[in-house]
């Protein structure tokens, strides 16, 4: 009989605080749309990982996203990991298309479709630890070299983060809206906290 793999879920206190502030200041419908989009995103990752036989030991949920910690065995190939990473945004795009189609009968669903679309494109930004940055690293490591992939991913992520910072500062000056700036600062903090090489090509 196969053993059931248990997955631990850890939620950061900052996540709870952020949700409480958002619920107090924003629309409950928008909050529900964002939570559903996040759930669909992580479900896409999880289903793909389980299809490839990978065990998910824990899910860490922070104010800036979620991280799935995998068990050591069995290791995924580069191709499998690329598909598993891409499955998150792909799930958002799929649900966005379905919700948009249903929105013809229920216009409120367009908000949910939009949240799915925004989360998909945000996660495809080529900045680690976002999915887009991870995909850049995996593709470079697969085709060139893992150490060169580290350098390339950091350069690309740094340039994109700097561009986003300039755009958010411009928006702050023009409209006085600090939310994009706070998001970019949080993304930049996660980017600079990213560790170096964690995989070797010869193990794939």
Show which residues each predicted segment covers.
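Hydrophobic transmembrane alpha-helices and their immediate loop junctions
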Residues: 1-204
